[in-house]
Structure formats: C-alpha cells, structure tokens
Amino acid sequence: MVLEVPSITPGELHDLMRLHQDAEWPECKKMFPWAHDISFGQPPDFPHSLAIVKSQSDANNSALLRNSLEVNDIFQSWKVRTSFHREGDTCETGNDSNGFQYPNNTKELLNLLKFQIRQLELQVDDVALENAATYCHNHSILPFLKVDPRGLSLELKRYSRNKVGSNTTLKRSGQDVWGRRGLFRRFDLQCAKMIEMVDNIVIYCSRTGGSTDMQTESAPACSHEGNCPNCTTLALLLQICLMFVQKGYVGSGGSLYKTNLFICTYQNFNTDIPQTLIGTPLLDNEFFKNNTPLNLCSSPSEIVCFNNVDKNMVLCEKLELNKLTSATRLEETGLICGNTTDWHNYQIIKKNNISLTHRFEENTSIVNLKSLNYDTDNPTTSISQLYNIPNTKEVWKLIIKCTSNSQMPSLTKIRTYLDLLLDDDASKSQEHLHLTFPASGSIGLGNLNIQSVEILLNVCYLIFQVSQVQELLTFMYCEDGYTETSLLLTAYIIFHFNIPLQDALLRIHPRPFFLFPSDLQILGHLQPVLREFSPQNGSNLKLYANALKFRDKSFQLHISSELFSSIFFMKIPLESNFVNLKGPLPSRILRHLYLGSLDHAQNPALLKSLGITHIVSVGEVVSWTLNKDKIAHPVRPHRAITMTNTNEVAGNTTCNKSRNRADTVVSDKQENGSNVVISENSGFQICQIENLDDNGKDPLFHQIDKVLDFISNSEATGGKVLVHCMVGVSRSATVCIAECMRYLQCDLASAYLFVRVRRLNVIIQPNLFFVYELFKWWKKHYNREKDKTMDWHIICRGIAEVNMKYT
C-alpha cells in the first residue's frame, strides 16, 4: 500500500473549518458511554467534522493553527527503560494472541508496526515503514492511539500504578461501562477520540524546505509542500492506527475506515493562512530574545501563549490565581497579604525605579481580557495587564514568608527586629526585615509548647508595632497567596481585633484562605490567649504604645505556665458554626454565588452568617428541610447508590495534593428522571434537583435553565446562593460553571478555570458527561464568535493538562 495524501490549500482548509464549525456535535446519548472508555465500539457519526494535527512541534510553540493537535495528544507515549521496568521482565502483554511485546528501541518499534501491518493485511513500502518507526522514536510515541485497548495492554503490563480517573481493567464488552469506577473523567482520551470520530484530518507543520528550523528573518518564510516527510509519515501512521483500532471493534463485521487525510500546503504561514485559523503566528527567534525590564514573565512567549486560547489553560490558571490572591490590605490593620509574584514585582519596580500605575480591583480576573499586543518598545503595557501591580508607594518593611519547610523564628530575632523598629535611622532605611514562618497545616496541637506560643504572640505583636510606625507595613506571602499564610493570618486577625475565631474567619472570607483541620484545632485552643494580649484591650494598647514611645527594647510578650496549661482544657463552643466543620468554608465564586458541600448546607446558622439566602441542592437532600417522617432516610432513598471512601474534602489534603473525592457505584436498573422542586424553609429559598447522581450518565442540562433562573432571581434581589452536592466538586461545580458562563458571558474553558481557582484547594472534577453537556449548552446559547470557538477535544486537553499534577 502506498498512501497518497492529497494536498489542500489554506483556503480549502478554511472551508473545511467552516463546515466543521457549523456541524452539530453528537447528542449526549450518542456520545456516551462511547466517550468514557477506550475504544471497543464504533464512534458516533459526526458529519463534516475536522481535526487538525501538527506533525512537528516547534521549540518555541509558534506556528500553531487554532484547534490543532500534536502527536503526543493522540498517540500513546513511549517510555523506555523506566523505573517501572524490572530486570528480566520481558514486558509481554499476557495475551499471546497479541503476539507483540513492549518495544525498547527503533528496531522493536518497526517490528511492532510490521505486526500491525500483517494483522491488517496491508502492503506497505519498507522504507515508509522504517520512516514511521523513526518518527515514533523521535516523538517518543507508540504506534497506537491512546484509545486502542491493545496498546494499553502493553502499557498496563509494565506500568500498573493507578492514576486518578484511569481504568486498569480492560474488558471487551461495553455493557458494564457504567459500573466501572473512576472511569468518567477521562479527559486525556478525548483528543484521540476525536481523531477516531472525525471525517477529515488535516496535517501541517512549519517545516521549511529540508530543515525543521525556523527562519530567522523578521517575516519568516515557511514554504510547506505536500511531500513533507514529517506530514506524509504521520499520515501513514494515522491510517495504520485508525484501521488497527477499528479492527478491534466488537461486532464491527468488516473494515470501517472512512477518514479523509489531507496535507495543508502554503508558501508563507503568516500571510497565506487566513488569520481566523492562526492560533500563534510563526515568529522569528529574535522575538523570544526580548526581555521585559519588569521580568514579570519569563519571556515574551507567555504573551504568545496567553493569546492562543487553545494552549493557555495552564498559564491562565496561574494568572487567574495570581490575580485572585494579589496583594491586598486587610482593613485597617497594616497587614498586606499576597503571593510570590507580588513580592517579586514589588522588588523589581522599586529597584529599577519604574513608573507603573498601581493596578488592583477586587475580584479582578483575566476571563474577559482580550488578546495582548507585545510592544517591544514598551513591554510593560501589555504584560502588566496580566497581573495586579502592587502599590510601590507603600513601604513594605516587615516581610513574612510562610513555607512548609520553615521553622518558627527565634524570640531573639523578633526582639532584634523590634529594636530596629525603635531606631529612627533603621526604621526609615530601605532595608527590609525578613521572617519565615511555618505554613498552615504544618503545626499540630501536640507541637505546641510555651516557647512556640510566645513566638506566635510576639510575631503578632511585631506586625502590630510595625503598623504603628508611620507609613510602615507588613507584607505576608506564600507561593499561591493563601494556602501557607492562612494560619498566621487568622491568628493575627484574632489578636488584632480581639474577636473569636468564627468572627475572624468571616472578616477574612472575602479574601482566599484555607485552613486545615489542624489549624482550626490550634486556633480554637489559642484564641483566648491571642485575645488576652489583643491591642483592642485598653490596658494592652497603652502598654504597647508606651513601649514604642519610650523605646523599650526589652519589652516582649510572655505567658505563664498556668495560662499555657489552660490552652489544652479550652473547649470550643458546640454552637460554633465554622470550627466544627470538617473542611473549609464554602468557596465564594461570584459575589452572589458560593460553592460548597452537603456539610455546609446542613448548617443553616453558618449560611446565615455568610449572608446566604438561597440554596441549590444538586442531587442531595438537606436533612433539616425534611419532615420528621423522612429524616431517617436523609440521602436519596429513591436511588440505589453507595458512597464509599468519601475522605472528606479537607481531611487529608496537603498543600500540593488534591483530595480524593467520593466514588459512586450506581445501579443501572433505574433511569434518571430528575426534576426541580422549589420551596421555602426556615427563611431560605431552596431549589432541589432531585434524582441526579454523579455516575457519568445522569443528564443535568434539561434542568439547567430553571436552576440558573433561580440563581439569577436571587442575585437580582440582593441574595446569595449556595450551590452544593455531596462534596462540592462535580455536580454543584457544573452548575457554578454554567452560572459563570451566563453571568460573565465567557466560554466554557474560562468559566471552568474561574471556578476551579476559586474552589482553592478543593479540586473540582465535573465528570466528562457534565462537561460535554456544558459544551453543548454553550454552543447553543453563547457561541457568537465561531472563529474563536474552542473545540470539545481541545477543552478536554486543557483540563487534562491542569489536572496532570494531581494524577
């Protein structure tokens, strides 16, 4: 077989893209359960569908078409001699009928390709096949689509470790697909699923003549011909892999291959290809050598990445979090909380004496930020829009960095800083006073002793005294701007205002914070001590003022052994709405919208203290809304469902890991018939979505307009809504994403990130079915700029990328 791949012009590609954009994506009932699993059966029909694949990546990620894929998105990765390779293990598949083993070099890759060719009864030129094996070697891929069960059997034999959302049991029947655990979040498969489903595949690259290097002229020439070896080899590989996966379909009854393959040719990438098709233009190397004097970005490539919506979800998550947690002053305290980027930018601006307008708005976001032009003469104009610029007119004197590997500062160091503060010359100098402090979640009640409590008290005292010196402020920060600073921040708010822990959390809540159960326990026991030394007590304030006025360098706070002992006998009031929670407070997504768990909804006093007036219960029943006859069965008595391994959302979380969410096992015997019931109870308006489970098949969006109308009516009357399910990561997160799409008039990817970032350390995980419903709903109601539409598989690729660090 000699594969002849026709060439198409950029204009013809544009026509194919228009047909694809106008095409109707398959209905949910046809897309699923096929999209959930590796491929045992035929894909749904999707007439006029198009996938674009780049055959050769560029080092600087330029020359990218919109909605285009790369080979690593489609093919299974090839890992050679990893730590999982046991000595003497031949890595055979365990299924002798497959007749192949895991390849460890190009020759074995070639043998694997030859095996596939024999199975398909094809005749392929030896040179072409050798080129395909070399291509696989160069790109570290196996000649299998990610959805091919036989390719996965190779990987599973040598790499048996489970990953979040992955399935390690291969079965030939699709009948049990709904019952398999962890299967309904395979976003990583959807690019390969798209390749398997589409009618047309267009291949391109930025290869110029005989070299894959870019031209260096300011307007790089990039002539791309139909005989490009990269593109023709990829076309052959795609044809073999598509036919091979189709051969494994259950009950296919013959050849199904129907995909049209094309290679796009052009003389100049930037001028020949319509601008609506270009995600990132071909850029010369000089562009990437320019550096901003602010150094806010590592290179101008971040501006390029931001402008390409197809490839920027990881970057946008970082930028959105930076905006959300940027430096803000807490009321009248003299304490500013922020993130590492704030401190970095503050130093750069001050050091270089750069005149840059302070930019900060509460609830600021990059969601509606348009494409940025990179001005080499004035780079800060565009780059500064990606960040909230700190106010460098403020004097940040005391700098406190909280990290997980920090020890408590010594009392001697704190006293030294107090001495410097009392020295006129030292206090007016530009030199900063630096402290480190242990991160939230790193101290347990059993770690406390008199010295550690005194250190915490004196750090709070130092922050207060810095604020009493004219124009001096304290900047407290950590990497993400909230996780590691929350313990010290909350302790200081209790100390400064002389308020109980519950009220302190309410004061902080407009700003992101996250307290671990151990933090709540410590603060609950320490709050009497912190309040006893609060400057809000008249005698304390006078004492602290005199220490500053008379330059008493020996003054420090001390506690008696009796007071220390009383800490451990202190009981947290049972009526405390916040401290007895098993996790964090509900996450504020918008001014009128909160996302939380069933635990939050079960606590009406907590909701009232947050100003919440409306509740949306997604598939769960709040016990206090039931009459006494029903309280014995508070959770969906009408559904055959078992919740296992709930592992409460804040229980076992570390700073860098996500929580495990509840696994759901659902009987197939009952069809979903969800409905919406609106009622009033105990002063709350309640919207109950009944009979909806997180099982990868229950539909939500036939009810979504009713739910969003309920939320909209609440917002119009000045109310606030809590949306919850069991844990607050899938069903309720889906509703919140839909509300953000409606309220912010943004696309699905932007709304997903907006909610994800504001859920803080609780990682949202809407199942694949819900996200596809969101996609279809957005296409129907809000897809006004089709040229900028992000395809389903591209959105899934982005979600898989931002979730990668948790797998």
UniProtKB/Swiss-Prot annotation:
* Recorded family membership: Belongs to the protein-tyrosine phosphatase family. Non-receptor class dual specificity subfamily.
Source organism per entry reads: Saccharomyces cerevisiae (strain ATCC 204508 / S288c)
- Which reactions is this enzyme annotated as catalysing? O-phospho-L-tyrosyl-[protein] + H2O = L-tyrosyl-[protein] + phosphate; O-phospho-L-seryl-[protein] + H2O = L-seryl-[protein] + phosphate; O-phospho-L-threonyl-[protein] + H2O = L-threonyl-[protein] + phosphate
Write out the ranges of the annotated region (Catalytic). Answer: 593-807
Q: What is this protein called?
A: Dual specificity protein phosphatase PPS1
Q: Domain Tyrosine-protein phosphatase: where? A: 585-783
Give the protein's biological function.
Protein phosphatase with specificity for serine, threonine, and tyrosine residues; has a role in the DNA synthesis phase of the cell cycle.
- Keywords for this protein: Cell cycle, Hydrolase, Protein phosphatase
**SUPFAM superfamilies under this entry?**
(Phosphotyrosine protein) phosphatases II
Q: Which GO terms describe its biological process?
A: nuclear DNA replication
Enzyme Commission number, as recorded = 3.1.3.16, 3.1.3.48
A GO cellular component annotation here is:
nucleus
Q: Report the active site residues.
A: 725
Q: Name one GO molecular function term.
A: protein tyrosine/serine/threonine phosphatase activity
